[in-house]
Amino acid sequence: MDFDFDPEKARLNPINHDGVTFEEASAVLLDPYALTRIDADTTDESRYITLGMGGASRILVVVWTERIERIRIISAWKANQPQRRIYEAQF
């Protein structure tokens, strides 16, 4: 799986979202227990929201889209308590 992202968004994301990097976020999309849903709030492209385990062993939320055989990460942040409960309820 190939990942892509806007370099400026990648630079700002850790500053705005508790140190979460797009590199860490990419691990969420490889998590076999990740939960994904369609982001119904966007109309210009198909976007997805995935809840899963990141590369630093913390549960993250990742917004992403598919673009020409690549996964483009748009944003990522630490899951809040209700989101963590949803993810952990699988086990």
Give short role names for the model-derived ranges.
Residues M1-F91:
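Ribonuclease/tRNase effector modules and their secretory precursors
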